[in-house]
Amino acid sequence: MADTSLVTMVRRNWQRATIALFLIALVAGFAPFGAVASLDKVASYFGHHTSSKSLQSVVGLSGSQLGIGLAVLRLASLGALPLASLADRWGRVSTMRRTLLVGLVITSCAALSPSYWFFVACFALARPLLTSTATVVQVVTVELSNAQTRIDRLVIVSAGAGVGAGLAAIFSGLLRGPESFRWLFALALVPVFFLRPLLRSVPEPVFRGAGGPLARLGAVPQGLRSRVATVGVIVFVIGVVSGPASGFTFVYGEGVLKISPLIVSLVVSLSALTGLAGLLLSRYFARTLGRRGTIVIGTVATALTAALAYGGGKTAFVIGYMSGVLAGGLLAPAIAALSTELFPHASRATAAGWIVVAGVLGAMAGLLVFGLVGDSVHVTGPGSLRLAALVTFLPLLPCLALLYRLPESSQMELT
């Protein structure tokens, strides 16, 4: 059992480049998640409470406004495609440096928001930059690893993204006051001063035979298009589930169920343990069941735990949220591995960009459906969003069978 221990895994893979990629993933996870973590406070500050038994009467903005705002943020992530494609031209490290720097600066501008839609606009401008950074981090992690260490390092990098999102949620709970969200957004400026020394530790991946002619920006070789499309459908389904599963979490927990922000912060902190368990399970399942089986289990678990969180009271929310973090930890490394291992170096970042597009479209669809169904029911308390959860999360799960049209990538050597 020693080989499966957390300490052994970290010690074996904790090199300077891996540490740097972990921290970059943390920062790229922290900045955009501030929009989700503070959404209840933003809605309450900029919205208007009504007397009707609707979501707006509880949180200040309607489900449609919240859903459209979150969908706009997801739509903006489509810009990650050309930005990630630039990594196949400019190089991985140079692209990460530029996109992360600009994305953090724009995120911090949201601290000056005079309205809800200005807040949405700032995060929408920053979102593609930070999404492309996270995408290229996964690509670099895979390219600097071999078949034996790849999933371990993806687990570590996924942990970084999870820690970043968790820190955003914790700070949101600890910062008090109606305008405390402004301080959270301003924190995005802090990492800017450490980017250059951090990125010096990351070597530029080089592959033999990777110096051929470049295709048009965003173009994928014809022989790989069906593979990109299949992975895209899978990621679309994951997006439909994960978009509203995370997007409305804090609105429902703090706004509808009236859970104290400090309690929410405590739940998020404890969820670090379940998230870690999910990452370790992902490492185990990705090697025993393969990437495809792990993705199926993780996606179904995400849908079921989110339905539990939105379908009951405070206890169901806490259990659903914490088990949902476990499901997310189980899913993230496996889908990151599959999305990068199936493609050659020359088009890997571009393919990853198209896969991000599919996830964005899925998340937008999920958020819009969830918001519209949520508006159609009386939001009076526990379980009010149960119907929205079931209608959104469950219908597309059979599409996961398409995974078995793809080759198992766990033992593939990168080209």
Placement of each model-derived feature along the sequence:
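Extracytoplasmic gate region of multi-pass secondary transporters
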Residues: A35-A37, R225-L279
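Extracellular/periplasmic helix-loop-helix junction of adjacent transmembrane segments
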Residues: L39-G79, L262
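Helix-breaking motifs and short loop linkers at transmembrane-helix boundaries and internal kinks
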Residues: G60, G91, L112-W117, N146, ...
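Central cavity-lining transmembrane alpha-helices of secondary-active solute carriers
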Residues: I68-A84, S269-L281
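Cytoplasmic membrane-interface "Motif A"-like loop-to-helix N-cap segments
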Residues: R89-L100, R287-T299
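C-terminal ends and interior cores of transmembrane alpha-helices
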Residues: L101-P114, V300-G313
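Cytoplasmic helix-loop-helix junction between adjacent transmembrane helices
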Residues: C122-A159
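Glycine-rich segments within core transmembrane alpha-helices of 12-TM secondary carriers
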Residues: R150-R176, P191, V356-L367
